[in-house]
Amino acid sequence: MSGKQVVILLGSVLILGCLQVAAATETDNKTNDFVATDEWQTIAEGQAIPRGLHVRINLQTGLKEAKLLDESERGTSLQSQPDDQNARESHDDNEPLALDYKPDIIEESIRRVKEQKKSYAELRKAYKEFQKNFRTDGELIVQLIDQFRNFSRTPLESEMRSKLDCLENLEYLLHQIDNALMFIDNGGLDDVLLPIVVNDTSTSLRVSAMRVLGSLASNNPKAQIKVFEKNFGSHLAQILTSSGNVGEISAALHAFGALLRKFPLAQQRVLSTSGTQALIKVLQSPDVELRSKAKVVTLISDLVLEKRSVLDVSKDDPEASSTMAQYVLLDFESWLKTPGYCAAVDTVLTKEFLLLLEQPEVVEQFATALETTEDMCTSTWSQSSGLRHALLTVRNRYANSTDEYRLEVSQILAKLCERLFNKPKHTEL
């Protein structure tokens, strides 16, 4: 064989070898491609994966796994960053898997952070403004008292709205016991309420002031004492005697009751003089509405029941002897009978019973008062044919009602009529 033939043979062998190596390499690359399924599969080190797979990485072991996305998982997968084949081929096999870069998500996140920062800054500013303007109840009360002191001594129409607003705020604040005492300690009775109740010509202001008075005295023994010491009892009695305004009478009754309830000394001093006469004058007035008259008999009934309750409890409580002694002095029977309480109630019910037919709550108030004061008025009421007619008319109307409350009131009236007239069989009108 010549040398030329040997060279040709060796060249052919080399070419064939290269082709085999290239084919093997291509086969290896194909077998090394990641084929995704619906199950999790381990990703080999350096192994490329197609886009759009669900990828998870164990941060402790470094194990990477991937699978096809479910429909509910679209848009949540980790994906390799290169978009084109050239970029993927040039990518280092050892470089970690990257998230898709989504400028819109990043910009949105930045925008939200800035908005939150702005909102927080605005919140801090608003809070500082709130702190600057914040006032405790005590500070508000002192401020309102000072505001009243700065009003003109002569009544000005331009100040009326401001005065009413001040009184409305005080009525709300003084329901609390401590606030009421702070108002009193800072001169509120002398500088605000007393001048209005005694001297002011505005009915609206007097009504508002008496509401404030009732608010601060209700269930507040220390405040009741201060109000009593300022002689508000007599001033309220005068208003009840002379006023014909429905709102003013209602407000005066509220303040009057707040002063007297659970305060036997005030009851003795006020009711033994002008107080009882003032209440009965309200009952006798043809210009006063029935609801206000119901408030009068309710107050009288409450005070009579209060005395009875205290005396009953004190019998078994030696420590209550001083309280009992104060209530023993209360002679409601003579205070009520002398100015004509029994006759006044008789007249109200006899003349206005038709109005009671549609006011069961008012009927109950009168029925309770009749029961409470029955002992001192039996001789008058049992002989009154007008009263009997009125009570039986209302009772019969309510007895035929389908309303449960009216039925209960009718039963109360039936028992009352039986005791007063002792003729249960007579139900004719």
From Swiss-Prot:
Localization per Swiss-Prot or TrEMBL: Endoplasmic reticulum lumen
This protein's UniProt keywords: Coiled coil, Endoplasmic reticulum, Glycoprotein, Protein transport, Signal, Translocation, Transport
Listed Polar residues bias regions: 75-84
Compositionally biased intervals (Basic and acidic residues): 85-94
Molecular functions per Gene Ontology: adenyl-nucleotide exchange factor activity
Signal peptide: 1-24
Motif (Prevents secretion from ER): 426-429
A GO term from the CC aspect: endoplasmic reticulum lumen
Annotated stretches, region: Disordered: 70-98
Keyword hit for Protein transport: yes
GO biological process: SRP-dependent cotranslational protein targeting to membrane, translocation
Main location per the UniProt record: endoplasmic reticulum
Regions annotated as coiled coil: 104-135
Gene3D superfamilies for this protein: Leucine-rich Repeat Variant
Taxonomic superkingdom: Eukaryota
Residues the record marks as carrying a glycan: 29, 150, 199, 400
Listed PANTHER family: NUCLEOTIDE EXCHANGE FACTOR SIL1, PROTEIN FOLDING REGULATOR
Cited function: Required for protein translocation and folding in the endoplasmic reticulum (ER). Functions as a nucleotide exchange factor for an ER lumenal chaperone of HSP70 family.
UniProt similarity note: Belongs to the SIL1 family.
Name of the protein: Nucleotide exchange factor Sil1
Organism, scientific name: Drosophila melanogaster (Fruit fly)
